[in-house]
Amino acid sequence: MTVRKKAFVYLIRNSEAGPQLLVFESLDEPGFEVVKGQSKPGETLEQTARRELEEEAGIADVLFLSRLGTTLWNGELQGFCLMKAPPGIPARFQHTGTGDGIDCGVTYSFRWLPIDDTLRALLVQGCDAFIDELIARAAVALGRE
């Protein structure tokens, strides 16, 4: 049996209000999602995360900070990456997906949310798997600027 692999991206940045996480409005249910997507054959988790960020959000030149953890859900190995955003990304923006997957042509509405205890209630199920680790590591990771 082949195990499918998926990368979830916790893209973070510093703001005047504190650490923030990039999310988009879910098209399927109330709440927000993070950028995510299936790995292509031979891709590492980091490579998948970088590709998905570029395809779904139009963002490149991110800094890979760490792997927060992995879960197994419905036969799918889901890895969660902590990445730092480059400067200059707007507070809110839209991007139309590129690439050859199901996201191609889909327009996503992105925004930044504060990284705190309220985040868990705002994210759709599955995207919230490593929120505690995100909260614990984000301030430290961003404090090194």
Regions found by a protein language model. Give the residues of each.
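Short, solvent-exposed aromatic-acidic interface loops
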Residues: 26-30, 99-104
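A generic fold-level signal
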Residues: 2-4, 16, 75-76, 105-107
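Active-site beta-strand termini and strand-to-loop segments that position acidic
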Residues: 11-15, 26, 83-85
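Active-site-adjacent beta-strand/loop module that shapes the phosphate/pyrophosphate-binding cleft
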Residues: 71-99, 110-117, 126-140
